[in-house]
Amino acid sequence: MAKFQGYLEFDGARQQSFLYPLFFREYIYVLAYDHGLNRLNRNRSIFLENSDYGKKYSSLIVKRLILRMYEQNRLIIPTKDLNQNPFLGHTNLVDYQMISILFAVIVEIPFSLRLGSSFEGKQLKKSYNLQSIHSIFPFLEDKLSHFNYVVDVLIPYPIHLEILVQTLRYRVKDPSSLHFFRFCLYEYCNWKNFDIKKKSILNPRFFLFLYNSHVCEYESIFFFLRKRSSHLRSTSYEVLFERILFYGKIQHFLKVFVNTFPAILGLLKDPFIHYVRYHGKCILATKDTPLLMNKWKYFFVNLWQCYFSVWFQSQKVNIKQLSKDNLEFLGYLSSLRLNPLVVRSQMLENAFLIDNVRIKLDSKIPISSIIGSLAKDKFCNVLGHPISKAAWTDSSDSDILNRFVRICRNISHYYSGSSKKKNLYRIKYILRLCCVKTLARKHKSTVRAFLKRLGSGLLEEFLTGEDQVLSLIFPRSYYASKRLYRVRIWYLDILYLNDLVNHE
């Protein structure tokens, strides 16, 4: 990013309208192609002159696209011509793929510059451990054990493209770029049902940016309600809702709501509340009664339906009591568990036994969904009985073994924070026996004969790093006892959900 900083310097008079000219600058395409900025992008091959030979950036493709962008009519292909010549649709698809990659990079520029200017003069401590998914669970263990109820919300996606355009309009003050963005989106959706589209999608980074912008707009309203409820009389909240309602779209409802807004916030005021969002879901934890939880529930429904014009069903907001219900979050089932403790206290000659009850957050593995995911991938049947992986029998023995070991260690690594390891051991047993059955099927032998020939050394490959570390730290007597059965380890290097968690 530093080597392109000179290109991004512009005077203050052009700050509001500098984005659109960048679409016609070749160096921005080089910036989009840069591997450091696109390490998560799988569509970089469209910038290559030949993806199988050379792996070089093609300036000719970029120049042709820029020439077509000067005349936007050349980017429009009528449906009649698309049916007669599908190759035109393929060419147009490549153009829009390149534009989506470029748009994701260009629109992020003002956001990054604004974020950098807000941190000037401030000393920020970098904590890479907070990037881990497992860093959320220690926070939940510390906070949720003191709360009673949780509101589990599935964040809806905007149905209409204009909602995304209007949301982006609040932050990008460049009309030309927004018009071009709207044009590309609608043109892309006009022919998305054709066969040329089935194996191609727009840039994932582009849609991730749009989704985050949409969620950021929703959270700005929520945090406004949460933080400004103590000084409503001095807050000009009419302007806020006028911006959200897309330029007076529901004027009558706006007047009614503004008049009753202080009373609504008074009902939602709660000093003890925590908010966590990840992977399209958010949870709201509080100590309050079910009555206030129902008010929050209908607040979310009205917020999405009235202010964002997104149809949102009340069934997507679940109110759960942690002492009775399980909270499904990031592949774990979490609930509060009462842990009784007996403390012996002695004062002089008198001794007392004091019964204490400590509330702990119990995180368990959703074994049913994991077995369903394993059955879908042909590791076992729907009952959890291991079967051979027939599709892998053409690979070498070492390749088959390495695949199973890698899957087993990834699962053990991700679910190391489970309070009870019984379900984890069952998953590892399924994978081990599936591996043995696959190897036995390849060599046309039985499982018993195959294990007798190789011995127990084959199963030692499945010993995870966690088991090796714990066996070195704790004594053998402790390692073999049931105490280690409840040891929970949260790793701070897990940045993505496990594939089995995303089985749905």
UniProtKB/Swiss-Prot annotation:
Keywords noted in UniProt: Chloroplast, mRNA processing, Plastid, RNA-binding, tRNA processing
Protein species of origin: Lobularia maritima
Record family assignment: Belongs to the intron maturase 2 family. MatK subfamily.
GO biological process: mRNA processing; RNA splicing; tRNA processing
Predominant location category: plastid
The UniProt record lists the keyword Phosphoprotein: no
Job of this protein: Usually encoded in the trnK tRNA gene intron. Probably assists in splicing its own and other chloroplast group II introns.
InterPro entries listed in its UniProt record: Domain_X, Maturase_MatK, Maturase_MatK_N
Record GO terms (molecular function): RNA binding
A single GO cellular-component term on record: chloroplast
Localization terms from the record: Plastid, Chloroplast
One Pfam family named in its UniProt record: Intron_maturas2
Membrane-spanning residues: none
Full protein name: Maturase K
